[in-house]
Amino acid sequence: MAASLSRLSAGLAASRPLGLSRSFLLLVLLLLNSGYKGDSTKPACGQPWWPKNLDLSRHWPWEVSLRVGNEHVCGGALIDLKWVVTAAHCIQGTKEYSVILGTSKLKPPNSTRTLLIPVRDIIMHPKYWGRTFIMGDVALLQLYNPVIISKYVQPICLPEPNYSLKVGTKCWVTGWGQVKQRFSANSTLASELQEAEVFIMDNKKCDQIYRKKSHIPRVVPLVLGDMICATNYREDLCSGDSGGPLACEVEGRWILAGVLSWEKACAKVRNPGVYTRITKYSRWIKKQISNGILSVPCTSAWLLLLFWLLQPQMGP
């Protein structure tokens, strides 16, 4: 690095007699800074490629396995080339996380379609209260490298903040947890990605279900406004899928309605899943993504160039 900086410095010094004023070069640099926004091409979201016979094969290209080492800890959903949404309670301490995309297998074989990308940065929502009383249970993961879009890796759409899903809307929940009908205390995670058809439930009814065995006073709601419930009363997914997507098809596009936040007594079929309602956080998510895009690569070379341009003119 020192050698390259020396060469750059020498090159800059040699270029001074060319007559290019510092003011002009500084203006060019500022224009580049204001105009460059990284890769401006955005992949189409929420439009997965599926075979005609969905009974034989269905894949969810935004599905993410969040990992610590080789261990799957939570699910997540790809929403942009370098951004994943998951539940905030999935993040613990200062562990080094990575994500796997492009596969339905918990332990994928070596394949060109499977992506393993380290997590560069984690942004927790400021209203997250913690694992005891969950609120603001959403986190953003910024990846070190952008994903390579294929039919196996595609982002899901973020819903507009004012969009409201009607009670009874059909959605899908996916993850590597066991389905409730096959749940047991000794269950391990499923080797293949599981899916379950669910329906949006009224928050008040959802709150009543969970309140029956709760000692919390009735004046304190368990299911808050930033949560959304879904179930089909027959089959749902169990623990191991926290942070996983609740995906709903709306006008031909799939949107991320929620990420799995919590549920109680997985073996009891009538207990719905409670998800973080993404519409409540769409603006925050978009703001973080826009703030996270560096307008210019902040390298030593750029800093040295800027420093050189701002130096007082030496000589005649």
Curated annotation (Swiss-Prot):
<keyword id="KW-0720">Serine protease</keyword>
<dbReference type="InterPro" id="IPR018114">
    <property type="entry name" value="TRYPSIN_HIS"/>
</dbReference>
<feature type="active site" description="Charge relay system">
    <location>
        <position position="89"/>
    </location>
</feature>
<dbReference type="GO" id="GO:0004252">
    <property type="term" value="F:serine-type endopeptidase activity"/>
</dbReference>
<feature type="active site" description="Charge relay system">
    <location>
        <position position="242"/>
    </location>
</feature>
<feature type="disulfide bond">
    <location>
        <begin position="74"/>
        <end position="90"/>
    </location>
</feature>
<keyword id="KW-0325">Glycoprotein</keyword>
<dbReference type="InterPro" id="IPR051487">
    <property type="entry name" value="Ser/Thr_Proteases_Immune/Dev"/>
</dbReference>
<feature type="disulfide bond">
    <location>
        <begin position="206"/>
        <end position="229"/>
    </location>
</feature>
<keyword id="KW-1015">Disulfide bond</keyword>
<dbReference type="Pfam" id="PF00089">
    <property type="entry name" value="Trypsin"/>
</dbReference>
<feature type="signal peptide">
    <location>
        <begin position="1"/>
        <end position="38"/>
    </location>
</feature>
<feature type="glycosylation site" description="N-linked (GlcNAc...) asparagine">
    <location>
        <position position="162"/>
    </location>
</feature>
<feature type="glycosylation site" description="N-linked (GlcNAc...) asparagine">
    <location>
        <position position="186"/>
    </location>
</feature>
<protein>
    <recommendedName>
        <fullName>Serine protease 45</fullName>
        <ecNumber>3.4.21.-</ecNumber>
    </recommendedName>
</protein>
<dbReference type="InterPro" id="IPR001254">
    <property type="entry name" value="Trypsin_dom"/>
</dbReference>
<feature type="disulfide bond">
    <location>
        <begin position="171"/>
        <end position="248"/>
    </location>
</feature>
<comment type="similarity">
    <text>Belongs to the peptidase S1 family.</text>
</comment>
<dbReference type="GO" id="GO:0005615">
    <property type="term" value="C:extracellular space"/>
</dbReference>
<keyword id="KW-0964">Secreted</keyword>
<dbReference type="InterPro" id="IPR001314">
    <property type="entry name" value="Peptidase_S1A"/>
</dbReference>
<keyword id="KW-0378">Hydrolase</keyword>
<feature type="domain" description="Peptidase S1">
    <location>
        <begin position="49"/>
        <end position="290"/>
    </location>
</feature>
<keyword id="KW-0645">Protease</keyword>
<feature type="disulfide bond">
    <location>
        <begin position="238"/>
        <end position="266"/>
    </location>
</feature>
<keyword id="KW-0732">Signal</keyword>
<dbReference type="InterPro" id="IPR043504">
    <property type="entry name" value="Peptidase_S1_PA_chymotrypsin"/>
</dbReference>
<feature type="active site" description="Charge relay system">
    <location>
        <position position="137"/>
    </location>
</feature>
<dbReference type="InterPro" id="IPR009003">
    <property type="entry name" value="Peptidase_S1_PA"/>
</dbReference>
<dbReference type="GO" id="GO:0006508">
    <property type="term" value="P:proteolysis"/>
</dbReference>
<feature type="glycosylation site" description="N-linked (GlcNAc...) asparagine">
    <location>
        <position position="110"/>
    </location>
</feature>
